[in-house]
Every structure is written in C-alpha cells, then in structure tokens.
Swiss-Prot record:
GO terms for molecular function: 3-oxoacyl-[acyl-carrier-protein] synthase activity; beta-ketoacyl-acyl-carrier-protein synthase III activity. It holds the Pfam family ACP_syn_III_C. InterPro entries: ACP_syn_III_C (IPR013747), ACP_syn_III_N (IPR013751), FabH (IPR004655), Thiolase-like (IPR016039). NCBIfam families: fabH, PRK09352.1. It is found in: Plastid, Chloroplast. It comes from Gracilaria tenuistipitata var. liui (Red alga). It is an enzyme of class 2 (transferase). Catalyzes the condensation reaction of fatty acid synthesis by the addition to an acyl acceptor of two carbons from malonyl-ACP. Catalyzes the first condensation reaction which initiates fatty acid synthesis and may therefore play a role in governing the total rate of fatty acid production. Possesses both acetoacetyl-ACP synthase and acetyl transacylase activities. Its substrate specificity determines the biosynthesis of branched-chain and/or straight-chain of fatty acids. It catalyses: malonyl-[ACP] + acetyl-CoA + H(+) = 3-oxobutanoyl-[ACP] + CO2 + CoA. This is Beta-ketoacyl-[acyl-carrier-protein] synthase III. Residues 256-260 are annotated as: ACP-binding. Pathway: Lipid metabolism; fatty acid biosynthesis.
C-alpha cells in the first residue's frame, strides 16, 4: 500500500469585505455583540454577475497548482467539498474544465463544515489503494447566497471562501496522512440545515408539488453543545489509535465556526492557545473552506514547519464530525 501526503495548498476569498459595523446597518446588532459571542470581526462575500463557488474554487486550485508548478493535466481526480454548488447536479466538473484538468475525474462531496476533512480522507483512500496518484481537493462555499440577511442569529456568522490542496502518492514510509476518525448522527440533522420545503398546494390535477430550498436554519446552543462534547472525543480517539498523545501535537486546526467553540474544545484537550490555528476573525464561518483557508494562511505566515503534526477536525451539519491527523510535508 502506498502512502499519501499534502504537497501544496492554496486559498481564495472574494474582494468584498463586510465588517460588523456594516452588518449592524442591516440587522439590530453591534460590533461588540458579535465579537464577544463569535470572535468574528469581518467576513468576505461573493458579489457580481454570474459569480459562483466555481470562481473561488478555481482561484484556490490554481494557486495550489502554481506553487509547485504542476500542470493541471497531471491531476487524476478532483473532489469539490461544497454545500453551495453552482449547479445542483454538481460543480466539480465545471472546476475541472476551468482549470484545464482534462484527464481528471471530478465529483462533488457534500458534508458541509466537515467537507474538507472528508475530502482528505476520501482522496487518501483512492491514493492508498493505488487508483490515483495526484488528487486535487477543494473546500469551497458561498453560504452568503443561502443566508436570511434579516436573521441576526445567522447572518453575522457566515462568509464565503475556498481552499484547495493537492494530495500525492508517496512511498508508504513517507505517508503523512496518519489517521482519521469520522462520525454522523442523522437524528440531529434539523439543528443545522438548509431544508427543502414543498408548496402546500398542487400545481395541477396530477397532484404534483414543487418547492424550494429555505435559508440556513441553526440552533446555535445545540450546535455548541454538540461540538464541545463530540469533537474532543473524536480527536482523542484518533490520537489513541495512532499511539500519539495531545503533547505530540504541534497544531490544532478546527473548523472555524465560533471563537467560543474553538476555545472550549482546546480547553477540554488542554491545548495551549499558541497551538491553535485560527483566522476566524477575518473570514467568519466559511463552511468547507474554513480549514484549508486557515491552513494556507498559517503556511504562508511560516507558522507551520515541516514535519509538524497537525490535528484537523471538522464538525457541522448532518450532524457530521471527524478528525484527520497529518504530518506537514510542504
């Protein structure tokens, strides 16, 4: 069995930045209220005619490719983790065409805020079983298009962005995707969802119904309790399986959901604040993009060193949560 490792990463965010003061002009809130409860100071929002998640995914992917001077034709598989596709049938194929990866298979993966973790795990399986050599994974979301901007419980939280990574086959002894642990509790799906709702009247004599997707709905208190209880347990279970302790970990990278969640999880694990990778204050909750966006920024800032052990954990809608432990090789 061959190994797998991340060899490059890139990210992209929209140009438009909306700070808390501007949000307070839309709904009844304030910068102090938002920062105190979430840690978010500003977020990026995608605007413009015909702009979609594909544009952000393309930009992030090209940055990851350009950093290592890789030809897109070398990519065998593209996995786009998104919950806000440009096309309900999937947007990965559009990314494939846009970057010129004509030889790659492409598909979407929908797991909301856990999407990038599942993309890493899925790509690693394809590589370790010998199916593919070079896989491009992308976490990208434009949840601003699915927000009720009159609902202050949700509109203050989310931003748009994309992050991409290239995972490549390597010798088994050089494997850097060390282990993973995944979970789902579908009984709690209503706590964070974008549900489809049918009209309550039929359109014709055949009793056929049509409807539409609703805005983001979230029970914040329940999501907090879920994350703070489940995520530390997932991380410990994953580390134990690898015979690693929390002291062996150089960096903790959690889905950038909320400052209180990040701090509570770190406290439960007894992780020092200086080991937490976070850019939540600048971008808000970017769903599947949040982990690669923070990882790329940490790398660009020389925060991460080669051979560092990074614990990555995503959690959110589904409810789904999971952990992957990697060794940094870039």
């Amino acid at each position: 069995m061959q190994g797998a490792q991340i060899i490059s990463i890139g990210s992209a965010v929209p140009d438009l930045c909306i700070n808390n003061k501007e949000i307070s002009q839309i709904v009844e809130t304030s910068d102090e209220w938002i920062v105190t409860r979430t840690g978010i100071q500003e977020r990026r929002v995608l605007t413009g005619t015909n702009k979609s998640v594909v544009d952000l995914a393309y930009s992030a992917a090209m940055k990851a490719l350009d950093k290592i001077h890789m030809d897109p034709l070398e990519i065998d598989l593209i996995i786009l983790a998104t919950s806000s596709p440009n096309d309900l049938f999937g947007s990965a194929s559009q990314v494939q065409a846009k970057i010129g990866a004509a030889r790659a298979v492409a598909f979407d993966l929908t797991a909301a805020c856990s999407g990038f973790v599942l993309a890493i795990v899925t790509a690693t399986q394809f590589i370790q079983n010998g199916s593919y050599k070079n896989i491009l994974i992308i976490g990208a979301d434009v949840l601003s298009k699915w927000i009720d901007w009159s609902d202050r419980k949700t509109c203050i939280l989310f931003g748009d962005g994309a992050g991409a990574a290239i995972i490549q086959a390597c010798y088994e002894e050089d494997n850097a995707i060390l282990g993973f642990q995944l979970n789902t509790d579908g009984k709690q799906y209503k706590k964070l969802s974008i549900t489809y709702k049918e009209n309550n009247y039929s359109l014709n004599t055949l009793k056929l119904f049509q409807g539409q997707f609703q805005y983001i709905s979230m029970n914040g208190k329940e999501v907090y309790k879920f994350a703070v209880s489940k995520v530390p347990a997932s991380i410990i279970k994953c580390l134990n399986a690898l015979h690693l302790s929390i002291q062996d970990v150089n960096w903790l990278l959690l889905h950038q959901a909320n400052k209180r969640i990040l701090q509570a999880v770190a406290n439960r694990l007894s992780v020092d604040n200086y080991k937490i990778i976070s850019n939540l204050s600048k971008y808000g909750n970017t769903s599947a993009a949040s982990i690669p966006l923070a990882l790329d920024e940490a790398w660009q800032n020389n925060q991460i060193a080669k051979e560092d052990i990074i614990v990555i954990s995503g959690f959110g809608a589904g409810l789904t949560w999971g952990t992957v432990v990697i060794k940094w090789k870039c």
